[in-house]
Amino acid sequence: MSEALLYSFRRCPYAMRARLALRYSGVPVRIVEVSLKAKPAEMLALSPKGTVPVLSVDGGVIDESLAIMRWALAQNDPEGWLLADEAATQALIDENDQGFKHQLNRYKYAERYPEQPMEVYRAQGEVFLLKL
């Protein structure tokens, strides 16, 4: 396998989970940090939708974070994450991608959401984190 190339954005939670799985699996990867305001032409050629993360490896492209995670774990899964209860795993993923992501954005960008103090958004997000 050639070295994988991951187009990423450090603050994107979907790119974060792709990086986490790649790191955990030990897959050699070169990470290209992307400015979302000036996306590289090379990335857009691989994935015209223009979202991160985008993984290029062995002539193929994976441009969904969960698919990148599953691919990485299929390469090497030392603690058996893929063997976990699929229904429980999917429920956590769904809660992360919906409710938690909603609160995370409000906490990270509190100036855009002045309806509540940022501490309220943080506390709402912590409810999910305590389940992990």
What is each of the regions a protein language model found here?
Residues M1-E126:
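GST-like domain detector, emphasizing the conserved glutathione-binding G-site
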Residues F128-L132:
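Short, intrinsically disordered, charge-balanced linker/junction segments flanking boundaries
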